């Protein structure tokens, strides 16, 4: 017969100690520090901050260390910590047009005001393992350059000529939704959709964005502009009556320029898709911009026929913490449910063999 296995508090405590032992690894190898994770695994830190909805490099590095490099577990840890923090208010919207740019490219124009700035990128590497990294040592110092001049957004250039739709503006008096405080409901406004996409699993968004390029809700995208750098964050101090700078954060912004749109009353123009994420997160912001544009199908009176255009499908399945919890709950005891299924199956098999006039096979579990 089936016997339920009971772990108990002692077994769980032993499992936690074993986890700590495995996390530390070989004691003869130096323990990795939080600054090492933050500085040398910076893209992983950026993803944890973005999908954890908390800009704190040290905390993200700690979460990665505690999670043994499992980024989804690290995101879960960061979100759990975030839930304990007090809310002092909302900052002013950041102005990415004033960004101190470290990287900025456009696939729509070769020559743009401010120029193309490659910055730190894997794009032109050969994707070959570098054995010199295993030996350690300092890399060659990067070339120095003059401070970058002003860089207007490519979409602003198109907008001056009326070639792209105006950036959709929210009602200034309307409250901004908050997915972390209120349950998701449909249909969702764009502010909630963008919040959801910013917190969404990068792999999920990448797959959906890829699906749009393969014809499932195709919107014929161009990477109008991708920029990465520092922007200043300001908080409106009501007592002082003006915005107070809090510091600077690193952001990646992607503006997708998409297929023409027009009607009997409106001239054809390009449409937009938007992505924004903490740190250097180009793959995430590009995928986000592709999916954002697809989710605007209802707004733009387009036929909804692809998964990436279905906001309920996308937004209900994009959260990796929620998805992990639902999938991994299958590891928890389901003894009663299984016994019920097992009893029903045995009854059905007995009826089947009785009707067939055959002897049932002896149950191996007995």
Show the residue positions of the predicted features.
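Acidic, serine/proline-rich low-complexity intrinsically disordered regions
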Residues: 142-366
């Amino acid at each position: 017969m089936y016997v339920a296995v009971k772990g108990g508090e002692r077994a769980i405590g032993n499992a936690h100690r074993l986890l700590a032992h495995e996390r530390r690894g070989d004691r003869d190898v130096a323990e990795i520090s939080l600054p090492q994770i933050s500085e040398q695994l910076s893209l992983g830190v950026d993803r944890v901050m973005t999908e954890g909805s908390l800009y704190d490099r040290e905390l993200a590095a700690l979460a990665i260390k505690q999670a043994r490099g499992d980024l989804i577990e690290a995101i879960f840890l960061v979100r759990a910590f975030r839930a304990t923090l007090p809310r002092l208010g909302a900052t002013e919207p950041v102005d990415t047009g004033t960004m101190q740019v470290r990287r900025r490219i456009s696939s729509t124009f070769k020559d743009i005001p401010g120029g193309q700035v490659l910055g730190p990128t894997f794009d032109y590497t050969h994707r070959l393992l570098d054995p010199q990294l295993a030996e350690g040592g300092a890399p060659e110092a990067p070339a120095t350059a003059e401070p970058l001049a002003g860089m207007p957004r490519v979409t602003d250039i198109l907008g001056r000529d009326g070639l792209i739709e105006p950036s959709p503006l929210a009602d200034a008096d309307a409250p901004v939704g908050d997915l972390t405080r209120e349950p998701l409901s449909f249909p969702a406004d764009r502010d909630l959709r963008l919040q959801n996409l910013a917190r969404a699993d990068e792999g999920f968004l990448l797959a959906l964005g890829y699906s749009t390029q393969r014809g499932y809700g195709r919107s014929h995208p161009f990477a109008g502009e991708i920029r990465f750098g520092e922007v200043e964050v300001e908080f409106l101090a009501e007592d002082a009556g003006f915005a107070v700078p809090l510091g600077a954060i690193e952001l990646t912004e992607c503006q997708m320029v998409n297929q023409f749109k027009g009607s009997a009353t409106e001239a054809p123009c390009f449409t937009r898709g938007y992505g924004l994420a903490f740190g250097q997160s180009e793959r995430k912001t590009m995928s986000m911009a592709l999916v954002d544009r697809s989710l605007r199908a209802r707004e733009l009176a387009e036929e909804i026929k692809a998964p990436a255009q279905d906001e309920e499908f996308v937004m209900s399945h994009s959260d990796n913490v929620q998805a992990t919890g639902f999938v991994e709950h299958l590891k928890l005891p389901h003894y009663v449910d299984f016994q019920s299924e097992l009893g029903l199956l045995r009854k059905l098999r007995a009826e089947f063999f009785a009707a067939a006039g055959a002897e049932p096979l002896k149950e191996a579990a007995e």
